[in-house]
């Protein structure tokens, strides 16, 4: 979408994805939260680059995408959340996901939900996501 699209104007934070042409920022920060798509930070290989960015920006929560896999991980006191994808999930479960995140200081609570029924995702969906990311890492070596 172009920068002046009326839909984009509804949001305070917008970042560029790997298929966007518009000059959106690669990341934005807000109250110790970093938001990025993740494609410029090697998220398929791990979080080393995002850890550096979050440390530089004094962020303890990082929201990212790119892998289309719902995950929550903690590295070096930084919580990384990928909500998955609403329409193009990469798991065997056959539905999109989103995350609801409650932040109270450094206390972070994350719930992953089915994008159509809004039901909570079961832990096996998150476990499958972690296994899938490990497979991606091995394939990309």
Which positions does each model-derived feature cover?
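Short amphipathic alpha-helical segments and helix-helix/interface helices
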Residues: 4-8, 50-54, 98
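Short amphipathic alpha-helical segments
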Residues: 5-6, 26-27, 47-48, 74-77, ...
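Core catalytic region of metal-dependent phosphoesterases/phosphodiesterases
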Residues: 1-30
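Hydrophobic anchor at the start of a short beta-strand
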Residues: 12, 33, 110
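Residue-level recognition of beta-strand microenvironments
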Residues: 70-72
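Active-site neighborhood of phospho(di)ester-bond hydrolases with catalytic His/Asp-centered motifs
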Residues: 13-18, 35-38, 61-66, 81-84
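Acidic, His/Gly-rich catalytic cores of divalent-metal-dependent hydrolytic chemistry
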Residues: 74-141
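Active-site-proximal segments of metal-dependent phosphoesterases and phosphodiesterases across multiple
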Residues: 21-57, 87-92, 122
């Amino acid at each position: 979408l172009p920068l002046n699209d009326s839909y984009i104007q509804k949001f305070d934070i917008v970042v560029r994805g790997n298929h966007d042409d518009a000059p959106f920022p690669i990341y934005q920060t807000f109250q110790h939260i970093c938001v990025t798509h993740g494609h410029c930070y090697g998220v398929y290989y791990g979080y080393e680059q995002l850890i550096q960015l979050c440390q530089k920006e004094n962020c303890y929560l990082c929201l990212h995408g790119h892998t289309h896999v719902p995950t929550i991980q903690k590295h070096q006191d930084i919580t990384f959340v990928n909500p998955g994808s609403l329409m193009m999930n990469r798991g065997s479960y056959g539905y999109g996901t989103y995350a609801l995140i409650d932040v109270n200081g450094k206390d972070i609570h994350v719930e992953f939900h089915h994008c159509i029924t809004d039901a909570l995702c079961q832990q096996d969906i998150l476990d499958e996501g972690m296994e899938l990311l490990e497979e991606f890492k091995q394939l990309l070596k």
